[in-house]
Amino acid sequence: MILISAWATGCASLPANTGRTQSTAFNAPDSTALGQLVQARRAQVNARADSAFHLLDSVDSAFSSRLALIENAQRSLDLQYYAVHADASTEVLLQRLRDAARRGVKVRLLLDDFNTVGQDAQVLLLQFEPNVEIRLFNPLTGSRASLVSRVLGSLHDVSRIQKRMHNKLFIADNALGITGGRNLGDAYFGTAEKSNFVDLDVLAWGRVVRDMSASFDRYWNDELAYPVQTLLSPDDLKALRERATAPPPGNDPSRTGVPPATPIPPPAAAPVSATATVLPGVSPTAALTQSQHRPPLNLQRVTLTWAPSLLMVDKPDKVGPGDEEADAGDTVVDGLLALMRGAPQDILIVSPYFVPGAEMMKTFADVRARGVRIRVLTNSLASNDAPAAHAGYARYRRDLLALGIELYEMRATEQTAGGLAGSGSGSRGMGLGSGVGGSKAGASRASLHSKAAII
């Protein structure tokens, strides 16, 4: 029976992607409160650069900054993620996104389709809110009840489905945006019970955010980005819609009139409803606890570094069928290698899944011959959440050491991770990722998830 099922699902194919319309980012950011705040903060320091940055190196700042962008958005919120997990922290963020949409903010959510299965498929319920549009990138076929069945149903197209969209963007009004290593879920914000990620993001202001939005638009309008309603069956749509539109068991304050956004209000924890859940499987009490302890970041007072900037992004067709990414010169890795070749003194790499490959090893050999110091921090086997990636790294370990490269592998305890990076919103430590010392998980397992190259 298993073999017959696998053969039958193997014949599944994607529908024609004819239901999508082209759309682009909001094009007048300076007319919004966030855009005006960017200009005001720049004028305060008479900055020559037109982009600014704030490192989000703690779980608290990572969560509160996303809340601040949602709370202060007036025209648009564009989110692009590899994974959005249906848990308490996501419930808080989705409630705020829903409320923003109800006050007239246009929300576009682009997700890689690999993880929208099981409980995490509940995230798609947001599609049925006004002003919300969700697209799924590089989708798999088959039921969302099981990842196994979806993989089996796509085995005939394995060259395509094994390439995933790992971009992570969170953009408000095309004026402020967050990018970095974090997906959305408890493990990325230090509140998962069993395992948390040590991670790193940056909050960007100004012109560079336009580049981030342009990248979002390229993926959003790509032929591999499918509107949710193109992929879900009529029965799936009916079930999701019934769940999404069912009246809550009590009064739902979020369904009453919500006032329009005011220009950058002082940080305050907006109420999270204990009944009007977006994710039916998440405990309302857990979401309420998250909200009460993490108010939005104060955007008026956050420290900023104004500096020239360059955004490097892989093209969407890197994810498509075939080997388009083999064309040199147009990937993020190509850009990073070019920067490394010009390093005069020191290279520091933080990577959770460090598998250098032949071209990077050649670059390392060349710069080491010039006396450039190279240090690499990656996961140990114990801390790695992707053992296959560690196996790939282990094959290069002896050769890396022979080049004189200094290798550091993170241990798997939260105490180590907290000591490495600091747990408070103002603590930097070595600045290599977000501390998880504030997690409710105590001594639970920690895994490095930060991605950074310092040259």
List each language-model region with its residue ranges.
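Charged, low-complexity intrinsically disordered terminal segments
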Residues: 10-168, 172-455
